Structure formats: C-alpha cells, structure tokens
C-alpha cells in the first residue's frame, strides 16, 4: 500500500545509533542546550538519549527536501518536549524552518527558553498545543518517543498531507489506566 511504499527499509544491528547512522557529533562543540544529556543524572540514560537523538537526526536529515526559492523546508517535531530532536535538526540544517509542537505548557516554556538562548526565534517556532491544532506547512513530520496514539496521529497527519515522516514510538508507558485495555479502548486516529 501507500504507507508501505514510503517506509524506509532498515535493518537491526548491534552498533550504537551514532555508529550505525554514520553521523558523529562533537557534543562539546555544540551550542549550549543542544546536548540531550545535559541535566541528566544517570550516565547510562544520557548516553542512550544521545544515541537515539543522533540516529533520528540522521534519518530526518535524509528525508528533508532541498530548499526552494519559495520557502524553506519545514520540519515539524510532534510531541517535541523541550526540543532535543527538532533543535538538533535545526542546527544541522540552518536553512530549514523547525516547528516544535508540544501539548504540555511547562515543557513548551522550556523549549521556548532554549530557542531564545540559541537566538533562533526567526527559524524555530514553538506551538503549545496538540497535533490536531497544527495547520501550517510540513515537509517532514517527526516524533521521538511518540507516546500513546501520537505515533498513529503523526503517520496519519503526514500521509494525509503527502509529506515524509520519521517516527520512533514509545512503549505506551504514559497511557494512564491502560493496563488490560484492548486496542479498541485506546485513543485512535
């Protein structure tokens, strides 16, 4: 089907994401706030977070179309949190417009602070709201640890708009009271 034709074939391997993707970053050389391990108390977790973000960024970079004269490509990070993924994409591709969509107001505030600290207000927009509320341009929709039905929503949003997507679902750990719920009882798009 249409969706199957658009899914990038990938193979599992035992390499860390950074090594498997070929994208190597000097974390110390990045602007303050782009390292997802900053503020993390657990070294193992911060290392895994870096690997996950780099693996996703490599996939996103390969999906972004070339810049045209009419407008820059737009990457929309759904469930963006404080912007770890979207902001790193913006750093790697400064010609791209990045939109961070996050429903939690406190986390939106953190994302806005990070955008302001980086001085990227002109090319990164933070929208505090749900995916259904976003009606702007989108060339690539992305989501890392897209909780609950958000993975389905991102795929639906992108296939409806005929844009690319790179999504990594989560373990459904944040669906309150979902223990023993059947598929028909979970939120669905």
Positions of predicted regions on the chain:
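Class I S-adenosyl-L-methionine
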Residues: 1-189
């Amino acid at each position: 089907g249409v969706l199957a034709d658009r899914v990038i074939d990938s193979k599992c391997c035992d390499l860390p994401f950074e090594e498997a993707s070929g994208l190597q970053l000097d974390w110390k050389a990045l602007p303050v706030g782009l390292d997802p391990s900053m503020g993390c108390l657990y070294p193992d977790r911060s290392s895994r977070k870096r690997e996950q973000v780099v693996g996703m960024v490599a996939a996103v970079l390969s999906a972004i179309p070339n810049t045209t004269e009419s407008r820059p490509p737009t990457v929309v990070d759904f469930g963006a949190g404080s912007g770890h993924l979207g902001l790193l994409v913006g750093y790697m591709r400064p010609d791209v417009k990045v939109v961070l969509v996050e429903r939690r107001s406190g986390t939106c505030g953190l994302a806005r602070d990070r955008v302001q600290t980086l001085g990227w207000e002109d090319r990164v927009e933070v929208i505090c709201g749900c995916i259904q509320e976003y009606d702007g341009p989108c060339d690539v929709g992305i989501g890392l640890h897209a909780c609950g039905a958000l993975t389905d929503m991102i795929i639906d949003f992108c296939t409806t708009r005929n844009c690319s997507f790179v999504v990594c679902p989560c373990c459904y750990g944040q669906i309150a009271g979902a223990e023993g719920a059947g598929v028909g009882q979970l939120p669905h798009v």
